[in-house]
Amino acid sequence: YPAHHITTGEGGMVSSKNEDIIEIARSFVNWGRDCYCVGSANLLPRGTCKKRFSKWIPGLDFAIDHKYIFSNIGYNLKPLDLQGAIGIEQLKKISKIHKKRRINKKKIDKFFEDNIDGIRLVREGEKAETSWFGVPIICDSAETRAKLVSYLEENRIQTRMYFAGNILLHPGYKELDDASKYPNANQVLEKVFFVGCTPTYSDSMISYIEEVILNYKLSCANK
């Protein structure tokens, strides 16, 4: 199940117009450092703050380099030049990737729509041109999903949950809010799953997906 359109390894992005949020985010990805010099500013002898070597820690009567003051508990999440180079090369192919994903999604949609009862498919808006991450399948019940997912997996077609669904039902987040306030997210957790539409699917792979779905239909009819 290759899901992502392109990859540069692990990573992500934070976007904000709030300078305080930007500064904190930069600190978190850089070991929790207090220094906010960016790019060529890292080469300035006195730093962006103009007081790089100062008494930064209360109670200590000597100067410390601001680049080595840690104001937050942070992480080492800085992207590598190699990751950027890989991403740039993949961006050159993004139009082809987008086109093939749309073609594959349309084909797989039809396989499910023509053969499987108890499901709904996700359609894009009239003016949209979605670059599909996968093929979302909405089932009429948890039982329908469990049965269909099990059959696909047993026949070597990988599936994925629709991410967390309602994150508030998960152990790490259950104390944050009342999950019942978000009924749509609960439905997603209970009834929705993905199959892939990666552009790397060959014609024979697409045909195999169709064959498995047809066999599922026949197996249901014979019970």
Predicted segments, located by residue:
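Conserved active-site segment immediately N-terminal to the catalytic lysine
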Residues: 1-8, 23, 68-69
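Glycine-rich phosphate-binding loop of ATP-grasp-fold ATP-dependent ligases
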Residues: 9-14
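PLP-dependent aminotransferase class I/II
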Residues: 17-223
